[in-house]
Amino acid sequence: MIHKNNYQQLRIGLASPEQIRAWAERILPTGEIVGKVTQPYTLHYKTHKPERDGLFCERIFGPIKSGFCACGNYQAVDNGKEFSSFCKQCGVEFTESRVRRYQMGYIELACPVTHVWYLKRLPSYIANLLAKPLNDLESLVYCDITYPNLYLARPIAEKPTLLQLKGFFKYEDQSWRYLFPRFFSTRGFEAFKSREIATGGDAVRKELASLNLKTVMECTYLEWKDLAKQKPTGNEWEDRGIQRIKDFMVRRIRLVKHFLYTDVKPEWMVLSLLPVLPPELRPMIEVSGGLLLTSDLNELYRKVIYRNNTLIDFLLRSEFTPEGLIVCQKRLVQEAVDALIDNGIRGQPIRDSHNRPYKSFSDIIEGKEGRFRENLLGKRVDYSGRSVIVVGPSLPLHRCGLPREMAIELFQAFVIRGLIGRYLAQNLRDAKNMIQNKEPIIWKILRDVMQGHPVLLNRAPTLHRLGIQAFQPILIEGRAIRLHPLVCGGFNADFDGDQMAVHVPLSLEAQAEARFLMLSHTNLLSPATGDPIAVPTQDMLLGLHILTIEDSQGIYGVRYFPYSKRNCTSFFKIPYFNSYDDVLRAKEQRQIHFYSPIWLRWKGFLRVITSINREFPIEIQYESSNISVHIYENYQIRKDKKGNRLSLYIRTTAGRVLFNQQIEEAIQGTLKAF
């Protein structure tokens, strides 16, 4: 529903028959009411003009050419008039042809049909409201082969009845033919049947209309309350059955509350009037050679009208038409409407002559290429761009890299204002020429503009709020957006070709919201569960594992370091280093590699956590200067002759030294920030 004056909103829900009729019906100056589509025809095969009362009728949906009626008469369109003018001969309104994009029609069904979304989709709303098995309802609606003669009896207490029937029952054709005529005349039997007995969608509609939602909610709540008081029986199967019943009651209460809150009646889930979409949304196009290409919806609408008109003829001649034939025709109408709404939901879809399934209304609106995601949510907007994302591990968590070509387009208005404000350009044209020529000064101004201006990155589909996050942009070379890999968890993105959209917040309020609430380093936890979102990826974990890997032989295998030279194996003593810088310098000079075992002098507090607590060292070496070296599994201590500790060396690798240095620098930087 769209309100032009206040604001625009789109609400999807059930529409009443009166609302559907109000969408389509119009009253001509002659008093004739138009809007009902009664013929299955589209265009005349010779003139290619819309057929009267057909799916493209100009009286119902508006003129094909602005100001021209079906007769070919012309009258200037005056949108300022309060009342439109109509052609006296054909009844077509003299108005703009664009009304065919929103003017609707309707088909008056000869029998009520259930809306397949509310019957077959799980959970089935109709089955939940009526508290009946879905299989029984389907057999009632479609007259399935399993229960071909299933009817629903609803005696009305206020009126006299001769049959004490209530609920589902089966009948045979012979019983109707021989039993009831003994008590009723033909007209009396028809009146009795329409009052007491129903089948198909009519039976479901009557059941839904008889529901008192408040009473249903109160009774269901009392039943749930009684079950909740029961203690577990100890039998696993019985307890599961009771839990399923309780879950069903909770779903039923929620559904009834939704109907009461939205002021929607349950019987609206059964259609008596079928809306017909505007012609421009289901076009028929003529190509070269006179060939007509049509939307699948037109063929599905035609099938509905054909079957509905056949049912109308059967009902008009009901005295001579077998009851079973009427029931089968009602089923055909139900199946045609189901195929129009959601083709294939009940099994095999309806196909065309090329064995291709028809594209139904559900197929048009759902999915990535549907009306909502592609046409409504996927529209292009100003100050936005889109590109492939690539990994940028050197970037801070809150920064992203924007290509120069994209950044100059997104921030062009701000750059122009900067050029004119600094008197580097006389007017708008000069500023645009400078940008087009890519003069060096524009990159300096662009960096100044981007310095305090965050951007929003979005990856579709946006399933939660972390699908859109703010970043501080920087200029990079290339044509891809550079992103830190740790922020990919919130976007559910990876670097195998994923694309992301960039949006520039313009107002100060939007920029403040992006800076204080949406920056990526402030969204490290999931808002739903509280679990960390920024977690290391698999390639990070693999890199850390390789960086910190060591020889599994321990102290017994790395006392001496083997290396190969000309197919000969030599042994060098494991080197000693005094600091991180010495280790990294030796790595740069290729004296060692990341996996080389080394002894590193350690000046801090040593806390050793091992699986085996050793009271004595593995080995004690004595030197000539009365210095002893106590060698343990992961460290060694040098002591003087009095037992005082002179130095401490730990066994590690160059890769672990590099990793530990990065961790220490990050922690110290965080402490300085606070």
From Swiss-Prot:
Describe cofactor binding as the record notes it: Binds 1 Mg(2+) ion per subunit.
Q: Name one Pfam family in it.
A: RNA_pol_Rpb1_1
What SUPFAM superfamilies would the database entry show?
beta and beta-prime subunits of DNA dependent RNA-polymerase
InterPro entries, alphabetized: DNA-dir_RpoC_beta_prime, RNA_pol_asu, RNA_pol_N, RNA_pol_Rpb1_1, RNA_pol_Rpb1_3, RNA_pol_Rpb1_3_sf, RNA_pol_Rpb1_clamp_domain, RNApol_RpoC1
**Per UniProt, where does Mg(2+) bind?**
D494, D496, D498
Task of the protein: DNA-dependent RNA polymerase catalyzes the transcription of DNA into RNA using the four ribonucleoside triphosphates as substrates.
Q: What is this protein called?
A: DNA-directed RNA polymerase subunit beta'
Whose protein is this, by species?
A: Psilotum nudum
Give the gene name.
rpoC1
